[in-house]
């Protein structure tokens, strides 16, 4: 699908009247000048086919589909976040509570930081080992060198560790990919150019990923991709997962699963993710995917109007609540706060509570700093995949990735873009950037502070 919209934008060949496309491409959509600015379309050419009841203020993801110019380029159709997932029934067991406290000195509960997540992973894999006659693991992930490995990292893993700067929906001047912007102009990904793609927090995040995958996850996880790994926690032998997409909620709440009670309620719960050692208040804390209606210039006018009408129908208040209850990918505040969602909440494992909490606002998609998502996405899985397989050291892989990102920025600078064309910074000594008080930051002396946990209710209070 990305190739289709990319082809239509780059060549002008009309393939489809509309797309549902990830808002991760917002920076590219804005800069190409080929995607319809919906703000102007709704009061101009599309005014007669724009619903008076559309109520854009009711959409929770509008800031994610808005360009640096304040104009709307995509209309959200579905959203899901990546959160922390854990077996609440196991965490609540008095025998496991006591054993954990005896070993680690604090309560087995929702982890506040990565140190606690690591302790809990070790606890279940190394110390508990078996529950009810079955081998159990304290961590689940996937490590196959495959395109889906890319979004495992580009979907805010660096910012969860603490890379980048403060700011919502994305850090400024350095975002969760480690790309620095000045104004709206991307100027570098490598630390030598003021970026953070190969900085200390990025290296820490990849090293932790590899360490946990090798030590605490099922052995087969290393050869799994996103699709293969997604269903594994439902089999009942995983204690927690730090990076779990809420899009799996519907599949994980089916009756007769090992992780579902007889009354249909889940044995598990989702909660806001723990934060890495480099994280500081004000930095985003996770990723939220937004699939959004996108119109491309050059589409025949009548086709575009028909497509816009249909797009609005699919997200209208008449439809969206039912769609949310079935797909569990909410887009409207009114749906989230509805009586129907309150009634559904006990069987959804914390989904409703998360989306009603202030914590939700710290989970955001890839932002406008990324000028060409289709070209830049592959560098993630190819380089980090090589590090996971031990083919190159982590720092070397990240250095190469940052250099490749800089090369893409340089190429875009040479070609030019419709708006906010990249302009690569000169390489400077690291001390120059460290003294600015923004990302990149120096390596911490201690990357494993004491583990800290909290009650579920407190985790929602960001």
For the regions a language model picked out, list residue spans one by one:
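Extracytoplasmic "Venus flytrap"/periplasmic binding protein-like
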Residues: 1-58, 93-95, 99, 239-240, ...
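Beta->alpha turn/N-cap motifs
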Residues: 21-25, 226, 243-249, 272-274, ...
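Glycine-centered hinge/linker elements that transmit conformational signals in sensory
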Residues: 116-122, 160-223, 269, 273
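Extracytoplasmic/periplasmic substrate-recognition and gating elements
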Residues: 66-71, 214-219, 228, 238, ...
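Short amphipathic alpha-helical coupling segments at ligand-binding clamshell hinges
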Residues: 204-208, 301-314, 376, 397-400
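Short helix-initiation/N-cap motifs at beta->coil->alpha
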Residues: 1-4, 112-116, 220-235
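Long, aromatic- and glycine/proline-rich binding clefts that accommodate carbohydrate-like moieties
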Residues: 265-275, 325-388, 418-448, 455-457, ...
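Hinge/lid segment of periplasmic solute-binding proteins
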Residues: 23-83, 267-273, 445-460
């Amino acid at each position: 699908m990305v190739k289709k919209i990319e082809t239509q934008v780059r060549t002008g060949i009309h393939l489809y009247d509309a797309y549902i496309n990830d808002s991760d491409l917002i920076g590219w959509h804005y800069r190409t000048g080929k995607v319809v600015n919906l703000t102007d379309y709704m009061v101009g050419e599309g005014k007669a086919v724009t619903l008076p009841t559309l109520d854009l203020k009711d959409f929770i993801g509008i800031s994610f589909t808005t360009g640096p110019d304040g104009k709307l380029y995509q209309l959200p159709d579905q959203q899901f976040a990546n959160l922390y997932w854990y077996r609440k029934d196991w965490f609540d067991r008095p025998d496991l509570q006591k054993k954990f406290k005896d070993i680690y000195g604090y309560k087995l509960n929702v982890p506040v930081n990565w140190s606690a997540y690591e302790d809990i992973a070790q606890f279940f894999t190394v110390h508990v080992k078996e529950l009810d006659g079955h081998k159990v693991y304290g961590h689940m992930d996937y490590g196959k060198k495959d395109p889906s490995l890319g979004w495992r990292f580009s979907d805010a893993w660096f910012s969860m560790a603490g890379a980048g700067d403060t700011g919502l929906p994305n850090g400024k001047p350095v975002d969760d990919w480690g790309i620095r912007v000045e104004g709206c102009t991307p100027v570098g990904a490598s630390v030598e150019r003021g970026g953070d793609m190969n900085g200390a927090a990025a290296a820490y995040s990849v090293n932790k990923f590899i360490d946990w995958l090798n030590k605490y996850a099922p052995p087969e996880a290393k050869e799994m991709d996103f699709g293969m790994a997604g269903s594994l926690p439902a089999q009942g032998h995983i204690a927690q997962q730090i990076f779990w997409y809420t899009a799996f909620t519907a599949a994980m709440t089916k009756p007769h699963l090992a992780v579902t009670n007889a009354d249909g309620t889940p044995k598990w719960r989702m909660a806001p993710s723990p934060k890495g050692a480099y994280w500081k208040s004000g930095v985003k804390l996770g990723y939220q995917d937004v699939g959004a209606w996108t119109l491309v210039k050059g589409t025949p006018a009548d086709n575009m109007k028909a497509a816009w009408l249909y797009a609005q129908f699919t997200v209208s208040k008449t439809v969206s609540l039912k769609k949310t209850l079935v797909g569990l990918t909410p887009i409207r505040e009114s749906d989230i706060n509805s009586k129907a969602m309150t009634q559904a909440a006990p069987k959804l494992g914390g989904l409703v509570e998360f989306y009603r909490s202030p914590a939700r606002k710290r989970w955001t998609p890839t932002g406008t700093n990324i000028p060409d998502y289709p070209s830049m996405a592959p560098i993630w899985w190819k380089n980090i995949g090589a590090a996971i397989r031990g083919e190159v050291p982590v720092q070397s892989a990240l250095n190469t990735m940052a250099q490749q990102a800089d090369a893409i920025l340089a190429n875009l600078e040479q070609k030019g873009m419709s708006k906010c064309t990249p302009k690569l910074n000169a390489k400077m000594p690291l001390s120059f950037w460290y003294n600015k008080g923004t990302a990149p930051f120096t390596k911490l002396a201690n990357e494993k502070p004491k583990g800290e946990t909290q009650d579920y209710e407190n985790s929602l209070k960001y």
